[in-house]
Amino acid sequence: LVPATGFYEWRASKDGKTPFFIHPKDIELYSFAGIWSTWKNEDGQEIKTYSIMTTEPNSEMKAIHNRMPVILHPEDEASWIEPSNDNPESLEKLLFPLEDDSLEIYEVSRAVNNPINNDKYLILAA
């Protein structure tokens, strides 16, 4: 599980990329479906990595991007992390877009493009 309160996505246009902040309307803290791995590089150093699963966009996200992160419903979180679950089909059924009309999406400042910036104003509507 990758906890989140929102995420950014950029819509490409002739004027460049426009950043948007996106979050579920009715859930303050939620989880992305994540996968992780530990491996050793050629020097023998252990490397820990993770990734967020994506799926096709719902109707709201289609206007911005061709995919979206998998946002798990709270009741599905335990199934996603159950270590004894070795049935891929039961997990695949969780990899779907969030329901239409469930996201709040708004444009934010391009200041979010600079990794030096780290402030709550970055999630405010532009």
How would you name each of these model-derived features?
Residues 1-126:
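Short linear sequence motif anchored by a di-proline
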